[in-house]
Amino acid sequence: MALPTNVLQQVQTYQRSNLALLENLNCFMNVSNTRFKDFEKITANLGSVVTFDLPPRFTTAQGLVASFQPAVQRVLSLTCDQATNTSYAFTAQERIFNVEKDTESYMELFGRSAVAEMGANIEANLALNSNSHVPVNTVVNGQTVPTGALHTESGPFRFFGDGVTPINSFQQLAQMIANFKNFGSVQQGIKVILPDVNIPPIVGTGLNQFAPKRNDDMAMSWEVGEFGTPPVMYYQSNLLPTQTAGTVGNSAQTLTVVSTNDPTGANITQITFSGATVNDANAIKSGDLLQFQDNVSGKTNLRYLTFIGHVISNQPVQIRATADAAADGSGNVVINISPALQSTAGGTQNINVNVIAGMQAKALPNHKCGLIIGGDAFYLAMPRLPDQYPFPTAAEYDPDTGVSMRMTYGSLFGQNQMGMIHDSTWGSVLVPEYSMRIAFPA
């Protein structure tokens, strides 16, 4: 017997899944120094830049006869020029028939996802201090736009790792901290941020060592945690930037010093090298790290002096390129560097001998950028944006990243459009001599 042909209606419903958000590992906001978070409230400060002091530097003379030296107030600036927003809009019909259909408004879930997205964007921007790639922005017709420049005053010039050899053991971490301290370092509050994917091999090698108490803790959490004396705190992030190096680093080319912009060695901020590929437009990229090589025939090994005391350390001289540099038709490349190198006596002397022709240096290839921060040297500003009268405005806080933001709700009169905007402005700076980049294979 044949089945009858029924005419049945199908009703598709939209059900809540209650799935959690795919969160990121947010630590930069957590470890930042928020002393200048609301610097716009400082009465005497005008503009979006606040300047703060760095410890003064002096030198010591032998004997009891004084040789007076200038007292110099060292400063660094924190510029609040970053801004971002996440927004969405609905018609009145969409609002009543879809977004607020449930007893619990779906608007809350839209807002939660928007806040998480913006928080991750800000966290990733803070991480760019690791390779000095935070963009310099300006305001044009109300919109924040990049100028093409970078905040090269922020971020480390020293580094650990070669970008090729894996960093996967506690011994390497211990050597890294030893190198960091050898130059001069704060005694408390050292923080290390590692790529999350590099944590398991480090923990794995640690579990192979006979350290029952430490290994019990690690096996329970599978985290590096803290170790050392005094303890060093280890964090992990999945938002760390990758330094895209120039040809010099990726081709492992050896550069040879031709000249510097200051032959006296009093203030070297630019070095001309030979040895790059002829007419290579991408020889050096801003943020590239270079290290002077040892055992060059007829040349003294370059070493940094300790930051305080001016004693020759064990640390080879490492520098950071502050701008892209192209090679000319002879394979020469002129590199602007940070920090300024000084071999002449004085409070800011930082190297043992002058940089002269014939010395050699090599740059790192592409690498993932981990970071060491000494104490509270990573500063963050995140001022509260004003209310947007007559639209309802509130201050929001993202519990996962710690980001503070403004939320504004409004409608376009007569246009059947209602929108929600989450926005924030901020700035950050990492004191160079208080930090070190960790070069993991990219």
Q: What residues fall within each predicted segment?
A:
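Short beta-strand segments
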Residues: V50, L76, T86, V317-I319
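Short acidic, glycine/tyrosine-flanked loop/strand segments centered on an H-E-D-like triad
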Residues: Q73-D102
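Short active-site-adjacent helix-start/loop capping segments
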Residues: T59-G63, T86-Y88, R95-V99, N416, ...
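Core alpha/beta structural scaffold of self-assembling particle/tube/pore-forming proteins
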Residues: V99-A442
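Long, position-biased, composition-driven segments near the start of the mature protein
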Residues: A2-P4, Q93-R95, M436-F440
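N-terminal "assembly arms/tails" that initiate or stabilize quaternary assembly
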Residues: M1-C80
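Short, conserved beta-strand segments within well-ordered enzyme catalytic domains
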Residues: T51-D53, S87-A89, I193
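A short, structural micro-pattern
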Residues: A44-L46, P70-V72, Q82, V186, ...
